[in-house]
UniProtKB/Swiss-Prot annotation:
Protein name: Transducin-like enhancer protein 1
Region feature Disordered, mapped onto this chain: 128-157, 176-348
Gene3D superfamilies for the chain: YVTN repeat-like/Quinoprotein amine dehydrogenase
Domain notes: WD repeat Groucho/TLE family members are characterized by 5 regions, a glutamine-rich Q domain, a glycine/proline-rich GP domain, a central CcN domain, containing a nuclear localization signal, and a serine/proline-rich SP domain. The most highly conserved are the N-terminal Q domain and the C-terminal WD-repeat domain.
GO cellular component terms, A-Z: beta-catenin-TCF complex; cytosol; nucleoplasm; nucleus; transcription regulator complex
PROSITE patterns: WD_REPEATS_1 (PS00678), WD_REPEATS_2 (PS50082), WD_REPEATS_REGION (PS50294)
Length: 770
């Protein structure tokens, strides 16, 4: 078939110089395979060797990074210590005699003069120590010596800190570590140290200069832009004045809340002094104003005039909006300073500053006292108050904080720290004695521990103040229920499906399981048409609702009927009921009467069985212990009283200097939170004289409710704020700003939802985020 192909002779003669046979080809292929196999084996050995070297280099990388990081930490720690000691010296020297002042000043100046020879010795010692440390980790990468006159590339001369930084740069440079965030931080930090006159200034320490210099940096300009945006967001409340409804008169017996006072805005998660913002003398105050109820409330005259504004509530989970009437820190003006309730002995501001300056962070884990970029002091109240406080107290984060530290905070705590956030310059002046509020350049605290003898001390928050199971992160508004009248009472069903809102002459029922529903599922007309509902309570079975308000009768509604209906009415001698409470067994109802009595009703027989008499003015709020044995009531006579329900007698009485508008008893026992007309929230221990006093509200506290887990509670006020607090010391968990006075609130049994009723004729539903 293939005669030409089977005739090999011409091909061999013409094109092939050797004989082509199959065995030879196989031998040649075998030789080539063996050669490739040997080459593969050689490459494999080389690859394994490179992998081993790579592992070794990674070990060196980690070792030198840790050394460099540790040196950076130590350098900043020593720098901060030097600044604080310099500040203390500057404060103490004026107390010396003139002769000693000069001697001490000269000694301080001599101590600042570090010669190049001393720096060379320091650098040499540090390098030798680093080499000794590296011997235990395999052959060290050789360290390049840095003469005293030469600086590492890209880093400006750093004065007295050159030795440490030169060493850390040598370590990182030889192992090819380009840690840009660290270098930026060093440049920013030491640029301030290099300012002319800084090292020779005794009376104006470096820590006081840093903030003025930072004002020219990009972080400060960004902060100003952020503030302007916040100001625009907040100023639209004021522009809604033309759209506000007519004044609504609410008949509320014997109430007399004062009008909102000038109160400050500050970072609620911090409770201490902000050393970074000492003496910002040139800081310009950007105009900002916040909406608060435009009218005053009068319970004494039986009228509560609410000038409300129709605007969407704005949730601010961190910082209240700044007020334009607040003084800039560093100035002597202190408008809005209110006299304190207690009068503790005067505290020497010099001693205070020294003590505050020498404090260390309360909650910084890890091998070093504070991460780089942080100001390592806890202030008077422990600014490092949250999980993220290990790297930044969330609101007091240094603008030079590196990305590595931020990432570490996220990994460790699951929350992204608010990098670059700077609190507004308008500092709050809370209701505290001037000697506590007036710490020079200090950021006012808002949580104070008050001892039995009236001593007030800012509270250092523990490291788990804002973390842990059952502690929310923030709250998100998910629904608005347009009731149509001022909502003075709200309650949530169990399980969470229906919300009941009490307004003028009726209670409306809303189904919140379908967020799209914008209209109530039913309306319960009760009391008189023009009388406001002041309280409504569901029995645990969810089938009975009790309603009280500006009438002498309480309405009992049967919700299990095909159409809700009134199944009974309870009539008392008092003209109004301000608050209701139900016993855990659902057998008894307690009503706070405008005449000061506490009426006890038998719900089964629908009769009045007892009255607790003691309040000399209207009883405004009430709560009952979980075991049903103890009742707590607050009154317009400035007292909080506890009652033994088994024996029918008064147990305790707490006297205050302000009317009591709201209270709540912690479900887990021991703590009672009280909301005041004076804008304070006080948390009392039921068996001890000690208490906590909280100062974030700017006007009277109108309602208060504990979460069912007992770990936190919320309060609302005439200042349009909803505040969430940690039990009992009052670390601020989150804060929401609504568009009008927030008159009432409730928390669902599963602690997942909060409902508030406000003066702009609506209720707001929040989802609690954990």
């Amino acid at each position: 078939m293939f005669p030409q192909s089977r005739h090999p002779t011409p091909h061999q003669a013409a094109g092939q110089p050797f004989k082509f046979t199959i065995p030879e080809s196989l031998d040649r292929i075998k030789e080539e395979f063996q050669f490739l196999q040997a080459q593969y084996h050689s490459l494999k050995l080389e690859c394994e060797k490179l992998a081993s070297e790579k592992t070794e280099m990674q070990r060196h990388y980690v070792m030198y990074y840790e050394m460099s990081y540790g040196l950076n930490i130590e350098m900043h720690k020593q720098t901060e210590i030097a600044k604080r000691l310099n500040t203390i010296c500057a404060q103490v020297i004026p107390f010396l005699s003139q002769e000693h002042q000069q001697q001490v000043a000269q000694a301080v100046e001599r101590a600042k003069q570090v010669t190049m020879a001393e720096l060379n010795a320091i650098i040499g010692q540090q390098q030798l120590q680093a080499q000794h440390l590296s011997h235990g980790h395999g052959p060290p990468v050789p360290l390049t010596p840095h003469p005293s006159g030469l600086q590492p590339p890209g880093i400006p001369p750093l004065g007295g800190s050159a030795g440490l930084l030169a060493l850390s740069s040598a370590l990182s440079g030889q192992s090819h570590l380009a840690i840009k965030d660290d270098k930026k931080h060093h440049d920013a930090e030491h640029h301030r140290d290099r300012e002319p006159g800084t090292s020779n200034s005794l009376l104006v320490p470096d820590s006081l200069r840093g903030t003025d210099k930072r004002r020219n940096g990009p972080e400060f300009s960004n902060d100003i832009k952020k503030r302007k945006v916040d100001d625009k967001d907040s100023s639209h409340y004021d522009s809604d004045g033309d759209k506000s409804d007519d004044n609504l008169v609410v008949d509320v017996s014997n109430e007399d809340p004062s009008s909102p006072r000038a109160s400050p805005a500050h970072s609620p998660r911090e409770n201490g002094i902000d050393k970074n913002r000492l003496l910002k003398k040139d800081a310009s105050s950007s105009p900002a104003s916040t909406a608060s109820s435009a009218s005053s409330t009068s319970l004494k005259s039986k009228e509560m005039s609410l000038h409300e504004k129709a605007s969407t509530p704005v949730l601010k989970s961190s910082t209240p909006t700044p007020r334009s009437d607040m003084p800039t820190p560093g100035t002597s003006a202190t408008p809005g300073l209110r006299p304190g309730l207690g009068k503790p002995p005067a505290i020497d501001p010099l001693v205070n500053q020294a003590a505050a300056g020498l404090r260390t962070p309360l909650a910084v884990p890890g091998p070093y006292p504070a991460p780089f970029g942080m100001v390592p002091h806890a202030g008077m109240n422990g600014e490092l108050t949250s999980p993220g406080a290990a790297y930044a107290s969330l609101h007091n984060m240094s603008p030079q904080m590196s990305a590595a530290a931020a990432a570490a905070a996220v990994v460790a705590y699951g929350r992204s720290p608010m990098v670059g956030f700077d609190p507004p310059p308008h500092m709050r002046v809370p209701t505290i004695p001037p000697n506590l509020a007036g710490i020079p350049g200090g950021k006012p605290a808002y949580s104070f521990h008050v001892t039995a003898d009236g001593q007030m001390q800012p509270v250092p928050f523990p490291p788990d103040a804002l973390i842990g199971p059952g502690i929310p992160r923030h709250a998100r508004q998910i629904n608005t229920l347009n009731h149509g009248e001022v909502v003075c009472a709200v309650t949530i069903s169990n399980p969470t499906r229906h919300v009941y809102t009490g307004g003028k002459g009726c209670v409306k029922v809303w189904d919140i399981s379908h967020p799209g529903n914008k209209s109530p599922v039913s309306q319960l007309d009760c009391l008189n048409r023009d009388n406001y509902i002041r309280s409504c309570k569901l029995l645990p079975d969810g089938c009975t609702l009790i309603v009280g308000g500006e009438a002498s009768t309480l309405s009992i509604w049967d919700l299990a009927a095909p159409t809700p209906r009134i199944k009974a009415e309870l009539t008392s001698s008092a003209p109004a009921c301000y608050a209701l409470a139900i016993s855990p067994d659902s057998k008894v109802c307690f009503s706070c009467c405008s005449d000061g009595n506490i009426a006890v009703w038998d719900l089964h027989n629908q009769t009045l069985v007892r009255q607790f008499q003691g309040h000399t003015d209207g009883a405004s709020c009430i709560d009952i212990s979980n075991d049903g044995t103890k009742l707590w009531t607050g009154g317009l006579d400035n007292t909080v009283r506890s009652w033994d329900l088994r024996e029918g007698r008064q147990l305790q009485q707490h006297d205050f200097t302000s009317q009591i508008f709201s209270l709540g008893y912690c479900p887990t026992g021991e703590w009672l939170a009280v909301g005041m007309e004076s804008s304070n929230v006080e948390v009392l221990h039921v068996n001890k004289p000690d208490k906590y006093q909280l100062h974030l509200h700017e006007s009277c506290v109108l309602s208060l409710k504990f979460a069912y887990c007992g770990k936190w509670f919320v309060s609302t006020g005439k200042d349009n704020l909803l505040n969430a607090w940690r039990t009992p010391y009052g670390a601020s968990i989150f804060q929401s700003k609504e568009s009008s006075s927030v008159l009432s609130c409730d928390i669902s049994v599963d602690d997942k939802y909060i409902v508030t009723g406000s003066g702009d004729k609506k209720a707001t539903v929040y989802e609690v985020i954990y």
